[in-house]
């Protein structure tokens, strides 16, 4: 199938001596091809234009995209800013850690990160909270016999996040509805009229923020209680830096957003890979039987190397965050390419996670690259979680819940004598932007 490129825009041109990929449409640029066929678009651009080229992201403007491995160093560079993220999606990411650098980023991060480290998660009993929720969900899958996997993992992740926040069961439908409306801000056109996505998304964000402020007040009134939100508020209040509650609320909302879509996608891909590679399923079942129960503490995760390898290899082959954006604050060089001050940059993690320059046999889904390694995990192996000051604070939480999910799935299905099986094709319907996920229609059977 041809890529979704504009056949009337074939002119080759340069911006700052860097080629622009032909085929952009008016208003939306290259977004149709980025959303539906990003890997092929990057390969074609590299083959015809080289390692550096401009892609048109429509409302977000032109981003200089680099496939040179030296571009990864920009993620830690002091003269590269994350502020572009807020410029692209101010309604969602304004005031959050992902869009900040320097002192503001450090102050906010230091104020809340302790609750998300292994010790904080263990003290808050997060593993004990998640385990029965995960077991109940995969038990329902077994009883039903087949599921639309991405929809199910998305619902499970929302259930876990809402349980993390202590939202009462009777309030869950309202939160589900507002959360779905909040997500519209990711792609909302900049038109603020009643009934349109921008207006609905802003109203949902304000509704969610108001409830989060109520959680913060309740946490302060009951300071002796444990739980992730209580621990985050307690750590925030003990911080040496005088920060407003707006900072805390914005970053709890970020936890809600970041913990759902990308993790649900990874979870769905894990099930898909288990369904299409019987040997992986057999290895996971063997490990789950040996462990005997869903782990609840980070200290227990070392007993589950197969589940951990499945989590890491899935993230490598199917990165849920395919692109990172930054802005050059001064003139830089990537390899031999000069990058002018103020250039908006795109660093395609999707390309680097499957690059032969960085990984052996990159197109093969191989748990052995994790199970047989003797050296520590490298920063390049965890690109999905960022690097340097912007390393994802939710890393340990994601690691815990995905290993828990693997073990619960294997124990539950093996007990019934069934295994996951693909009931539909995988490649058609994949999406790559703003986050990547498998087709919404993929069905998995358990038989």
From Swiss-Prot:
Q: Could you say which EC number(s) this protein's record lists?
A: 1.14.14.-
Gene3D superfamilies attached to this UniProt entry: Cytochrome P450
Q: Tell me the residue numbers annotated for binding heme.
A: 392
Which major enzyme category is it? oxidoreductase
CDD domains named in the record? CYPBJ-4-like (cd20614)
Q: Could you tell me the keywords of this UniProt record? A: Heme, Iron, Metal-binding, Monooxygenase, Oxidoreductase
Cofactors: heme
GO MF entry, a single one:
iron ion binding
What does the function comment of this entry state?
A: Cytochromes P450 are a group of heme-thiolate monooxygenases. They oxidize a variety of structurally unrelated compounds, including steroids, fatty acids, and xenobiotics.
What's the family?
A: Belongs to the cytochrome P450 family.
Q: What is this protein called?
A: Cytochrome P450 BJ-4
Q: Please tell me the species this chain comes from.
A: Bradyrhizobium diazoefficiens (strain JCM 10833 / BCRC 13528 / IAM 13628 / NBRC 14792 / USDA 110)
Upper taxonomic classification of the species? Bacteria, Pseudomonadati, Pseudomonadota, Alphaproteobacteria, Hyphomicrobiales
